[in-house]
């Protein structure tokens, strides 16, 4: 087993925990796994009670709202992603925030990046293996079916899927607003 700074910090962070030695070992393993795989720049804004389960990469200037759960999100490009409150991001979600300029002075594309940030509203659910293309905006309460390729704007409460993602249904707005007013939010997940 290789050791590194993540092993040291995993031991330091778990040494004083009032749990059994076996439980401490399990926690250390999870910490080591997450230390190795996380790339979150110092100027990313992370709200309260945000949970990451596995590897994620977030670009500088990105933000995550309170009580959001992320299993595995990879933000690529030089743009940012803004994720609202109480949203859930499933595994292997790719968000591409910039693209090469194919109308530039070189072919097949120029060195210039065209940056288009991505926005995900509050109370959204992004399914596994979804790809969010530059400039995507997902409205409050929308659901994106797993495996979708999303470009453009998805309206609030829409349920969409496919390649390219198309809206095929809407959530019940009355029920959604009632649950929201009552504060009935999905508790930030524990994926074990």
Predicted regions located by residue number:
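Conserved active-site beta-strand element of glycosyltransferases/polysaccharide synthases
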Residues: 160
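Short beta-to-alpha loop/turn elements within the nucleotide-binding domains of ABC transporters
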Residues: 62, 136, 147-148, 154, ...
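Flexible, glycine/small-residue-enriched loop-and-beta-strand segment within the central core
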Residues: 51-137, 171-172
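Terminal amphipathic alpha-helical/low-complexity segments used for targeting or macromolecular assembly
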Residues: 1-36, 86, 93, 99-105, ...
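Short linear elements at protein peripheries
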Residues: 2, 17, 21-67
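A generic "structured core" feature
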Residues: 84, 133, 143-149
């Amino acid at each position: 087993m290789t050791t590194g700074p993540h092993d040291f910090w995993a031991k330091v962070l778990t040494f004083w925990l009032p749990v059994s030695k076996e439980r401490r070992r399990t926690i250390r393993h999870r910490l080591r796994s997450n230390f190795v795989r996380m790339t979150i720049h110092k100027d990313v804004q992370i709200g309260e009670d945000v949970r990451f389960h596995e590897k994620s990469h977030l670009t500088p200037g990105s933000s995550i709202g309170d009580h959001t759960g992320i299993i595995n999100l990879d933000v690529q490009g030089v743009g940012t992603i803004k994720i609202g409150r109480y949203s859930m991001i499933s595994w292997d979600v790719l968000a591409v925030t910039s693209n090469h300029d194919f109308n530039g002075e070189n072919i097949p594309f120029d060195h210039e990046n065209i940056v288009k940030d991505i926005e995900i509203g509050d109370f959204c659910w992004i399914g596994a293996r979804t790809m969010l293309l530059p400039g995507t905006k997902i409205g409050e309460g929308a659901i994106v079916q797993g495996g979708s390729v999303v470009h453009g704007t998805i309206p609030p409460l829409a349920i969409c899927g496919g390649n390219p993602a198309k809206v095929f249904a809407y959530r019940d707005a009355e029920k959604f607003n009632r649950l929201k007013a009552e504060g009935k939010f999905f508790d930030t997940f524990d994926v074990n």
